[in-house]
Amino acid sequence: MRVIDFYDRHPISEQHVLDAVRRARSVGPLAAEDLFAFDQDHYGGLAAVDVLARRAGITASSRVLDICAGLGGPARFLASRRRCRVVGVELNAGRAAGMARLTRLVRLEDRVAVVRGDAVTLPFATGLFDACVSQEALLHIADKAAVLAEARRVLAPGGRLAFTDWIAHASLGDGERRRLNAWMAAVTVQTLHGYRALLGRAGFKAVEAEDLSDEWRPIIRERLRMYRGMRAELTVRFGERGYRDYDQLYAFFVALVEDGKLGGGRFSGSA
C-alpha cells in the first residue's frame, strides 16, 4: 500500500476531528485547546509532544519544522503552548489541506503554516529551523538516511531533532514485515540501534535513543478499543467489509506489540 492511500483511509480524519469537536462543543468560537482531545494522531497525546519539545529545546523564539505533520495537532499544540512558530511539511494532499483548515478554524495561521512536500527532499533553505520534530512517520519512508540528512541540513548550527517512530525487535519476522508494508505502508521498520547509527552518520551529535515499547503497549490497546468504538462512523466511510478488514489488521498490529516483536522509540540529536 502507498502511504498516501493509507492516510486517505485512516480512521482519524479532519471530518472525525470536526464531528468530535461539535459533539463536545455546540456553540462559540473554537480555540486550539478545543481540538487537543481529538487531533493528536500519535501515541502518548500532549505529554508525548511536550517531551519532544523538551528534547528539541523548543522555546518561544524557535523556528520549528514538523516533518510529516499530518493534520497538524502537535504543531498547533506547540504554537499554542510554547508560542513558537511551526511549519508542517506533509506529503498527503488531503491531510495537508485538513491541517490548514483546522489551523484557520482556531485562528493560529499566524503561527502555524503547512507546506505540501516530501520529507526526503525538504523544500526549505539550509539552516532555516532551530528544531525539527516528527512522530511515528519515518516507518513509511524507505530512505531514512535521506530524511535524517535533510533534517540535519535544514537545522541551524546547534539546532535539535527529536522524533518518535516504530521500531523492530529481533523477533519480528520477514512475513510480518511484509504484512505491515502491505497494510500500512511500513516500508522499513528500523531498530533502536539502527536509528542511533543512522543519526550518527547523518551528522547528529549527542544522540539519544530511548525504547518506549512498554510505554506504548497500553496505548495501542486503547487505540484498538477506540477504533472499535468508531465502528458505525467507519462503516459509513468505508463499508462493513472495509471496517472489518481494518479491525483485523489493527488487531494483528496490536498482537505484534503485545508479543514484543514491535515497539516504539524516541530519538534526539544536535546539529
Place the predicted regions along the sequence by residue.
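Conserved alpha-helix/loop element of class I SAM-dependent methyltransferases that forms part
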Residues: 27, 42-60
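Short alpha-helix
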Residues: 187-203, 209
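Conserved Class I S-adenosyl-L-methionine
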Residues: 208-271
